[in-house]
Amino acid sequence: MQHSTSEKTRVDPSNPETIPKFVDELPIPAIAKPNRMVNEKYPYYAIEMKEAKHQFHKFFPETTIWGYNGMYPGPTFHVKKDETIKVKWMNRLPSQHLLPIDRTLHGTSHSPDVRTVVHVHGAHVAPDSDGHPDAWFTRNFKIRGETFKQKVYEYTNHQMGATLWYHDHALGITRLNVYSGLVGFYLIRDPLEEELQLPSSEYEIPLMIQDKSFNADGSLFYPENTNPPAEVNPSVVPAFIGDTIVVNGKVWPFLKVEPRKYRFRLVNASNTNGYTLKFENDHPFYQIATDGGLLSEPVKLNSLALEPAERADIIVDFSTLNGQSLILKNSNDEGDLGFIMQFRVVLPLSEKDMSKIPSSLCSDEPLTEEMATKTRLLTVGATIDQYNRPMLLLDHRMWDDPVTETPSLNSVEIWKFINTTPFAHPIHVHLVQFKILHRRPFNLDRFLEDGYIQYTGPAIEPNDNEKGWKDTVRADPGMVTSIIMRFENFTGDYVWHCHILEHEDYDMMRPMKVIE
C-alpha cells in the first residue's frame, strides 16, 4: 500500500481520524541477552532505563519515550523454568519527568521526580527482588527509597511456563513511568510446552496492547488535570484512555502471516482500558493459557476480555484464510479504539504445519475451599479527598496505613473482594498465582448501610478461560469476587493493588506481609 507525501502532511498525531491504520509492520521486541560475567554462577543481565526517540507511526515525527535499554517495549526475556537469572536494573534517565507529576500523591511530595523500580508481574520471587513500590532508586542509585535492599535482582523462575511482563512500579508515579514506555515481556519457558507441539519459534508472537494519545508534534499526551480542573495542578485523573491503539510500540500495525497456526502471547499493558478482543468475521481462536500458565485444556472462543495487566495465550489458525486480511477488533468501542491490528495471510507456507492444538494441556493442582485457614473480606471502594477529587481505596485504607493482610507461610487463604464502585477493578496480588472461585451479586445498599453481605443470587463460576492460574482478577461492580491462593517459599513485604494505574497511584494499593 503506497502513501503519498501529501498524506503524510495531513496526519495529525493528536487527531486519530487523520492517522492511517495498518501502514506499519508489527515489530517483534528484541531478545534480552545476558552479559557474560566470569564470577557469576547464573546468567546476568544489565538493563538500562534510558530516554530515547521512538517511531510510533511512519507518518509521525519521532517521539521521546523512556525505555529499557532505550527500547519500547523493552527487550524480551526468554528464561527457562527453574533456571535462576540475575538482573541489574539501572536508572539512566534524566532528572526531569516526561509527564506532569501530582505532588499530593503518596511518595511524591518529598521524593525526586524521576524514580524507578522494576516489578516482574506474575513472578514468584523473594521480596527484595519483587520491585516493592518504596524500593525505588534514582539515576545511578544516588537516592534510594526506604525499602531498597539490593541493586541486583534474582529471579528463580520456580513456576510454570507463562507469559509474564515487567514494568515500573515506583510509588505515586507508576502510571506515568509505564505510560512513558517502561514495559517489556518476560517469558518463562517450560519443557512441557515443547512436548505439546504448540506453535513456536517465528510462529509464536508476543503482543503488548496499550492505548496512547499524542500531541500534534508527536510527543506523548497525558492529561495534566481533571475535567473540570481540580484545585491541585498537576492533578491525578481517575482514569485515562488514549485515543489510539499501540501494539508492540506501533500505532495500529499489521502483521504478515502464513496460512497456518500461530500462538500469540497477549498482554494488556494499558493504564486503564480493558478490551474485548475478537476478529471482525468472528473467526474463532483457542485460549491455551492465562496469567500464570497453561490451562488444563484449550478453550474455543470468539471473543476474549482482557483487563489491564491480564494475559492470555491464544492459538489462531489462519490455514483457511490464504490471501485474506483479518482485523483484530475491540468490541468495547465503536470508534477508532475498536481497531487493534490487522493480520494479512499473504506469506507462503514455508513448510507443513506440524503444530497442534492439543485436547489437553496440563494436569491441574486443585485448591479447594476446605484447604483455606482464613477468609478475608476486602472492600473495593471510593471516597472524596480534601480537594474534592475521587480517591479509590482498598478496605477503606490508604497505602500508608499499617499492614492488615498478613498471611502465614504455606497457608491457604480466600480473599473476597466486595466491589462497591460502579466499575470493574483488576486486582493484582504480588508473589502468588491464585484461582478464581466465583463471583456473586450482593445487595449494595444493605452493605453500605450496615456492612452485611446479603447475596441476591447464586455464585457464578468463572468462565472456562478464567479457570487457570491468575495473578490479576476482574472484580466486577456489585459482585463479591472470591479467589483462593497459597503463600509459599517466601516471607516478607509485598503489595496488592488495583492495576488501573491511575487507581493504584491514588490510593488503591495496600501492603501485604507474609509471616512465618
Where are these regions (language model features)?
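Histidine- and aromatic-rich segments of cupredoxin/plastocyanin-like copper-binding domains
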Residues: 125-142, 209, 213-216, 221-368, ...
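Beta-strand signatures of extracellular beta-sandwich domains
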Residues: 46, 117-119, 276-278, 426-428
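N-terminal, post-signal-peptide metal-ligating segments of extracellular/periplasmic oxidoreductases
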Residues: 1-120, 124-143, 150-152, 229-264, ...
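Surface-exposed acidic, glycine/proline-enriched linker/cap segments
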Residues: 144, 233-246, 450-472
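C-terminal substrate/ligand-recognition segments
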Residues: 364-369, 374-436, 441, 469-500
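Divalent metal-coordination and catalytic microenvironments
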Residues: 47, 87, 118, 168, ...
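Active/binding-pocket-proximal capping segment
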Residues: 280-293, 420-463, 501-504, 513-516
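Extracellular/periplasmic metallocenter environments
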Residues: 93-97, 107-194, 302-346, 421-425, ...
